Amino acid sequence: MTSTQRTLMVMAGGTGGHVFPGLAVAHRMQAQGWRVVWLGNPAGMEATLVPRHGIPMEYVHFGGLRGKGLATKFALPFNLLRACAQSLRALRRVKPDVVLGMGGYITFPAGLVTVLTGRPLVLHEQNSIAGLTNKVLAKLAKRVLVAFPGALPNAEWTGNPIRTELARTEPPQARYAARSGKLRLLVVGGSLGAAALNEVVPRALALLAPDERPQVVHQAGAKHIDTLKENYEAAGLSCGSDVALVPFIDDMASAYANADLVICRSGAMTVAEIAAVGVAALFVPFPHAVDDHQTTNAEFLAEQGAAVLVQQRDLSAELLADWLRGQSRDSLAAMAERSRSLAKPDATDEVARVCAAVAGANLEGKQ
């Protein structure tokens, strides 16, 4: 580190919804010559993922309380004190000019210590309903940023930081106008597979006449791909030119851009990516998400006619088939354009600029 180089510490962990937007900001700051160090849990996904991106890590041991047993709750004071001590040592080693909290359990003790030691804290809340940690820390932070308007009081609406390629796709009007023939459907189950989608979508497609049936790319996660294939075969649909079943999609920007319609869950990052690309979506929120935040995430687009929201309890093959029959490429294009109009494609730059400003620096240019 040079004597004039500034340092950002990113605190994030636990799930991709916290880690990936943090990585987007980290890379933006590195491109501006900043040193970036990550604070995470050695047992979290960040411990494996972040070092692959060339970002050094500091570790704090701290887990959540929600849904845990009495033993965990009784041990909370000790675990919190230990995590605060580990956070203090990490902050003293790294000496960050600004600390960015992107969520995850470790953000609570590390955020408290950041404020108590006089370092500037910037918070970013990815979901439409803020978690308890950010609700507390928002009262102490220098700047509070949100992906969805109204998620936290007196916060700045920046949107969710996303990968650069997602924000650079061709506008939906041009993409949809250039297509003809069958509709293109992308079903995204994620790494967990989204069993409800894997079961209902094949049966819904089987209810459509062959000339009504869209071309399908269905992603289901490696552990679920065999079951998914069985579901399609049971519905009388075989893999071929119109049905592609895949365990993973490397290039989500192209996958979204090539689709007329996406059927998927409504995690914060998924909603942000779909809006950034501008593609029609039918959201089926994960029913067991904390505070049912996936429903309110989806409502942000659905209430503006930029997506359709169907609760999992209401989803059936018959309902989905009937809805698909009523769609055209023009109707989906209109939905996609409304979605794009609600996007915050410069969110990564905005969050990075705030971090730089809090540290008394400027950020040059855009991604």
UniProtKB/Swiss-Prot annotation:
Its EC number is 2.4.1.227. Pathway: Cell wall biogenesis; peptidoglycan biosynthesis. It catalyses: di-trans,octa-cis-undecaprenyl diphospho-N-acetyl-alpha-D-muramoyl-L-alanyl-D-glutamyl-meso-2,6-diaminopimeloyl-D-alanyl-D-alanine + UDP-N-acetyl-alpha-D-glucosamine = di-trans,octa-cis-undecaprenyl diphospho-[N-acetyl-alpha-D-glucosaminyl-(1->4)]-N-acetyl-alpha-D-muramoyl-L-alanyl-D-glutamyl-meso-2,6-diaminopimeloyl-D-alanyl-D-alanine + UDP + H(+). InterPro entries: GlcNAc_MurG, Glyco_trans_28_C, GlycoTrans_28_N. GO terms for biological process: carbohydrate metabolic process; cell division; cell wall organization; lipid glycosylation; peptidoglycan biosynthetic process; regulation of cell shape. GO terms for molecular function: UDP-N-acetyl-D-glucosamine:N-acetylmuramoyl-L-alanyl-D-glutamyl-meso-2,6-diaminopimelyl-D-alanyl-D-alanine-diphosphoundecaprenol 4-beta-N-acetylglucosaminlytransferase activity; undecaprenyldiphospho-muramoylpentapeptide beta-N-acetylglucosaminyltransferase activity. CDD domains: GT28_MurG. GO terms for cellular component: plasma membrane. UDP-N-acetyl-alpha-D-glucosamine binds at residues 15-17, 127, 163, 191, 249, 294. Its main location: membrane. The keyword Membrane applies. It is a peripheral membrane protein. It is found in: Cell inner membrane. It comes from the Bacteria. Keywords: Cell cycle, Cell division, Cell inner membrane, Cell membrane, Cell shape, Cell wall biogenesis/degradation, Glycosyltransferase, Membrane, Peptidoglycan synthesis, Transferase. Belongs to the glycosyltransferase 28 family. MurG subfamily. PANTHER family: GLYCOSYLTRANSFERASE, UDP-N-ACETYLGLUCOSAMINE--N-ACETYLMURAMYL-(PENTAPEPTIDE) PYROPHOSPHORYL-UNDECAPRENOL N-ACETYLGLUCOSAMINE TRANSFERASE 1. NCBIfam families: murG. Cell wall formation. Catalyzes the transfer of a GlcNAc subunit on undecaprenyl-pyrophosphoryl-MurNAc-pentapeptide (lipid intermediate I) to form undecaprenyl-pyrophosphoryl-MurNAc-(pentapeptide)GlcNAc (lipid intermediate II). This is UDP-N-acetylglucosamine--N-acetylmuramyl-(pentapeptide) pyrophosphoryl-undecaprenol N-acetylglucosamine transferase. The gene is murG.
